Amino acid sequence: MLKDNDAAKWVCREHTRVKHELLEKYLRAWIPILGSGNPRIVFFDGFAGRGRYAGGEPGSPIIAVRVADELAAYYRQIGFTFVEKDPDNFSNLQSILKDELKTTRNVNRMEIRLVHDEFSNVAGALLDFIEKWKATLVPSFFFIDPFGFTGVPFDIARRILASPRTEVFFTFMLRDVNRFLELPQLAGQMTELYGGDCRKQLPPSGDRRQALVELYRSQLHDVAGAKYSLHFKLCESDSADTLYHLIHANNNFKGHEIMKGVMYNQGVNGTFAYLGRNDLSERTQMQLFDPQDTTALVRELHSRFAGRTLTFDAVRESVCHPWHQEPPFIEKHFRAAIKGMVEEGRATLRSVTSKTSRGLSGLDEVTFL
C-alpha cells in the first residue's frame, strides 16, 4: 500500500477534480448562508493533504481559503482547522499555505489552525470538550477525505452530527471496503467504520456494493440521527469501476437541497455520479432525452399528497423522508411538475410568497386534487 506522501497519490485525476468542484460549489453557498446569520463558522478538513497536487492544482485547504477570501463580505469570522498526520505532507501544507496567505486579502477574518495529528484524535478531543461543557458546535462543515477507510470511526461522525448546525462530507472508499470486507485482520477497522459489524447486517444477496453504501447511510440516519443524506458516485478516471462515494449528511433541509442541486448538476442528469471513461458518452446520449421529464415525479406527488394542501417548501422537504425513497429530483423539477398538474386540473395554487400567479416558491400553497 502506498504511503500518503507517495507522489502517485498526488496526481490530480479527474475524479479528484470533480470532488473538489463539488466541494467548492457547495462552500460558495454554505459560507454566505451560515456566515450572514452567525458570528463564526468553521471549516474542518480532517485529511488536509499536501496543499497542492503534482501538477500545481490546489488541494482542499487552498480551495476553501480562496472561496472564503472571495466571500468575506458574508461573514464576520471563519475558522479553519487543517489536520494532516503524514509529516512530509504536513510540512508541505505549511509551506503552501504560508505562501497562499501572502495574497489572501481577508486573512484578518480567518483563524487558521494546522494540526499534525490524526483526524480521529483532533476531532475526538474537540468533541470531548464540547460534550464536557454541554456546549454546541458553531455552524461547522467537516470535510473527511481519507485515502482509505481506516482512521474514520463512525462514532466521530455520530458525535459531530449531534450538534444541529454541523455537516459531514465524507469520502466513503467503496472499492477498498468491498475488496477487504472479508479479511479477518481488518474486521476491527470495518466495525469502527460502520459503528457495528457490517458483515452481519448486509443482505445475503443482491448488489453488495450498493448495500455497503446504503448500510453506511442507514447508520447515519438510524444511529447518528442525521435527517438528510445524499451520495455521489465517482469512478476511476480511466475506467468505469466505482472508486468511492461522496456522502453528505446534515440536519438542515436548506443545506441538503443546495447540495442535492450541486450534485445533480455535476453529474449526468439524474445519475448523481461521475462515470469515469463513460462520463462523456453518457452525457452525449442524455442529450437525446428531456431532462425536464417529470412524469415519475407527478406520480409520486399524487400518490403522496392527493387530497392535501402543503406549501411548496413542505412538498420538497416531505419527499426526502424516508431517506431511502427520496426521488432524484431538484427544485426546478418540482416546480415544473406542480405547474403541469395545475394545468391538467390535478392541483391548485394559492400565492403567498410569489407576487404573481405564475410564480411558485416558498410558502405558496399547493392543493393536490
List the predicted regions and their residue ranges.
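Conserved SAM-binding loop and adjacent beta-strand
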Residues: 12-25
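Class I S-adenosyl-L-methionine
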Residues: 131-140, 147-340, 344, 350, ...
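Glycine-/small-residue-rich active-site loops that bind phosphorylated ligands and cofactors
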Residues: 15, 53, 148-149
